[in-house]
């Protein structure tokens, strides 16, 4: 015996998704990807910049020690007590850490994201009354009451604007102008 619905010529509904439903799902995934991918790429670049800042720790200590021992900022890496070759301080995304008249210069290599590859970021030492040496990252504000260390780029106690070549959107808040 046949089923009554089939006998009358009724159509059967197929199970599964229609083409329209699948296209809607693909469109939603595309929209989410368009939002998520740039945010993730920005996060990756910021992490690479952070590596560069972290690599400055040892050099900052050496510049401070040299300043307190000699009364002026070291002109070179060797004067700061570091190896003379800037590429000796390198990492996965950083090709060199240099000392240029007391100012630390991080250069990002070509393993880094294309947005920062080949660019630099600077840290400038300042002396403040009561707190010793503080560091100015890139184009951030000069520390309150801070005067540049004797012997740093710009000479004497003048404030110098040392702009990083890394776009500010990738810098930590402490490094932004």
Label each residue range with its predicted role.
Residues 1-20:
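N-terminal leader/signal peptides at the extreme start of proteins
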Residues 28, 45-48, 102:
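Amphipathic alpha-helical protein-protein interaction surfaces
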Residues 40-43:
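A short tyrosine-centered beta-strand micro-motif
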Residues 45-74:
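Membrane-proximal N-terminal amphipathic helix
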Residues 20-24, 45:
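Internal alpha-helical transmembrane segments of multi-pass membrane proteins, especially GPCRs
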Residues 68-177:
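Periplasmic/extracellular, small/polar-rich flexible segments of pilin-like filament-forming proteins
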Residues 23-36:
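Alpha-helical hydrophobic helix detector
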